[in-house]
């Protein structure tokens, strides 16, 4: 941390927002805000209730990214003062009203219970604003100017307009305008970054009025991927990451929920899976937990995408159904059959596997579909040699295996589509196995920019996350132990993706690098990845944050600035220092609770 403090002292309060908005203007007037400030929620569309007056609204900005934010007439839906805290609990899917209600509640909590005292962002002997004689924020107007799409709680990429505008006048009127509830939530998040806790612990203020912001994201898919199989995580661990995602305007949370090491997902119709496959019977995500996590994400405009990786990375199934898995836990020559131990792969030509997957997905998919438009079927690092031990195949010949893999993927994706979900796969299915994928399928790339270029050249939508930049677990050394006879050959025991990926490296990654201009529209966005061989609840927060925030800004603001240049570390460093402090408060205080 010694290197961060000097950067903090360089912070210009005119540019401390993260991720960086499209346009931002501010002044130097001090305004204090009280806990009883009213939130006036205005809305257009057919679902408006509690109408008490009609308010024509005009927002004018030379650089407004969304002309639809202008000249809209909206109605007062309701006024909220001192909103109750919410944990997002509920039954069924999430509506636009749910998102705005939660956003107002969490904004109030952030302003008055989780705010930042910015002492380290000023030089010594800085004179803190005094409440006496200062102006006040008199109201916060939240205006949703268009009817939300039906899919607001589980959208496909691009279905929700996430743009917003924000103004704060010297007279103390804050106005957030957006075409969707998610955009309004983003605007409220930005509003909290304009305010700071006073050292007297009784007041909250800004010294930036008047403010004018217009903003919208560069990429449609902005997320992190958390592996909850190799280490066991609690619901609260997951919720904290969702909170931080939302605060960084990330809109996807990828839950890599199962792998060879453990099966922590409870499947009520197949209880043996988690009862025998989890590290302990209590280290599971119950059906209720699973619903809670998905809804908690959706109510913050963060779509949780669940992944059950297959056919590889499935050794944990063998603890309950050994007949379904080939090459299970082979030692010591595990590297012949898998990328890492324990080995184990679903058999590729077994009717029993098909029956199992049909039952598994019939259980899981209906519990995913209220909260997500996607389901991730995995497909990475499948080792052909495992099938030499599969009595249904007995070969590692690609000519024999490829048609069987095609059949395997088709079977799974057909079932995913029947529930109205869009399949997601890892890049190997397309690039290594030459599986023909439907044009609806999202391909997730992790190995190289060249792979992204290949995927888009084939006409497929892609998610980026090059392991050389956006793998957050790298640089911690080998997690395997070596026999003394061969240990010297692995010295100094670096992992495969060393060195450690610091925020500057993460920030330097361009998701569009190497992609032909005519194919760049197929890059939906990307994810930063947290694999958990050496990460657990003890260190997960600091392993992900604030480095993932660097990826969040690239995905929201783009890798290039308005002049087409690579984004500046000089500009980013002080802003990231402040976001680090705010993320720490969000994570340390834990999930929003009722």
Predicted regions, residues:
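Loop/turn elements at helix/coil->beta-strand transitions in domains of secreted/extracellular proteins
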Residues: 248-253, 298-303, 370-373, 417-422, ...
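Contiguous, structured surface segment used for ligand recognition
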Residues: 14-218, 551, 555-562, 569, ...
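Active-site neighborhood of glycoside hydrolase catalytic domains
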Residues: 335-337, 342-441, 446-456
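Fungal secretory targeting signals
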Residues: 1-16
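Flexible, acidic glycine-rich loops studded with aromatic residues
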Residues: 114-117, 121, 423-431, 435-441, ...
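Structural recognition of the beta-strand scaffold that forms the well-ordered cores
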Residues: 31-33, 37, 41, 222-225, ...
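Feature activates predominantly on carbohydrate-active enzymes
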Residues: 151-356, 361-376, 527-531
């Amino acid at each position: 941390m010694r290197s961060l403090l000097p950067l903090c002292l360089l912070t210009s309060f005119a540019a401390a927002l993260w991720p960086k908005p499209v346009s931002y203007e501010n002044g130097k007037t001090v305004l204090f805000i009280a806990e009883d400030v009213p939130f006036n929620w205005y809305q257009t569309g057919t679902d408006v209730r509690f109408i008490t007056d009609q308010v024509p609204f005009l927002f004018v900005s030379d650089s407004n990214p969304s002309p639809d934010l202008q000249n809209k007439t909206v109605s007062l839906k309701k006024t909220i003062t001192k909103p109750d805290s919410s944990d997002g609990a509920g039954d069924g899917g999430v509506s636009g009203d749910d998102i705005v209600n939660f956003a107002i509640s969490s904004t109030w909590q952030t302003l008055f219970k989780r705010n930042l005292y910015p002492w380290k962002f000023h030089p010594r002997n800085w004179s803190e604003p005094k409440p006496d004689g200062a102006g006040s924020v008199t109201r916060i107007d939240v205006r949703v100017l268009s009817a939300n799409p039906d899919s607001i709680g589980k959208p496909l990429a691009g279905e929700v307009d996430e743009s917003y505008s924000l103004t704060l006048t010297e007279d103390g009127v804050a106005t957030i305008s957006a075409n969707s509830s998610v955009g309004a939530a983003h605007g409220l998040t930005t509003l909290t970054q304009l305010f700071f806790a006073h050292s007297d612990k009784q007041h909250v203020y800004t010294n930036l009025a008047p403010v004018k912001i217009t903003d919208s994201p560069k990429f449609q898919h902005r997320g992190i991927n958390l592996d909850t199989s190799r280490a066991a995580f609690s619901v609260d661990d997951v919720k904290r990451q969702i909170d931080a995602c939302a605060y960084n305007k990330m809109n996807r949370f990828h839950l890599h929920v199962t792998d060879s090491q453990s099966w922590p997902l409870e499947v009520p119709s197949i209880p043996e899976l988690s009862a025998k496959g989890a590290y302990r019977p209590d280290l599971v995500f119950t059906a209720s937990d699973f619903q809670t996590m998905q809804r908690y994400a959706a109510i913050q405009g963060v779509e949780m995408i669940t992944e059950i990786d297959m056919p590889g990375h499935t050794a944990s199934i063998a603890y309950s159904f050994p007949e379904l898995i080939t090459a299970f836990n082979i030692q010591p020559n595990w590297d012949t059959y898998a990328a890492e131990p324990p080995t184990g792969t679903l058999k590729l030509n077994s009717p029993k596997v098909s029956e199992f997957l049909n039952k598994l997905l019939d259980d899981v998919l209906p519990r995913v579909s209220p909260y997500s438009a996607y389901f991730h079927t995995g497909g990475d690092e499948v080792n052909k040699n495992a099938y030499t031990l599969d009595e249904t195949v007995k070969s590692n010949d690609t000519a024999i295996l490829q048609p069987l893999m095609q059949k395997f993927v088709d079977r799974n994706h057909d079932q995913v589509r029947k529930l109205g979900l869009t399949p997601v796969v890892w890049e190997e299915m397309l690039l290594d196995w030459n599986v023909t994928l439907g044009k609806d399928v999202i391909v997730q790339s992790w190995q190289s920019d060249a792979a992204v270029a290949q995927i888009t050249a084939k006409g497929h939508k892609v998610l980026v996350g090059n392991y050389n930049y956006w793998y957050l677990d790298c640089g911690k050394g080998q997690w395997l132990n070596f026999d003394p006879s061969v240990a010297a050959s692995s010295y100094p025991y670096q992992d495969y993706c060393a060195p450690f990926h610091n925020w500057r490296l993460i920030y330097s990654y361009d998701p569009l690098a190497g992609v032909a201009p005519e194919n760049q529209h197929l890059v939906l966005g990307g994810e930063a990845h947290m694999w958990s061989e050496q990460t657990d609840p003890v260190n997960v927060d600091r392993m992900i944050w604030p480095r993932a925030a660097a990826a969040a800004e690239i995905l929201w603001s783009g890798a290039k600035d308005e002049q087409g240049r690579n984004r500046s570390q000089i500009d980013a460093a002080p802003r990231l220092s402040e976001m680090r402090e705010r993320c720490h408060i969000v994570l340390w205080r834990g999930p929003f609770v009722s």
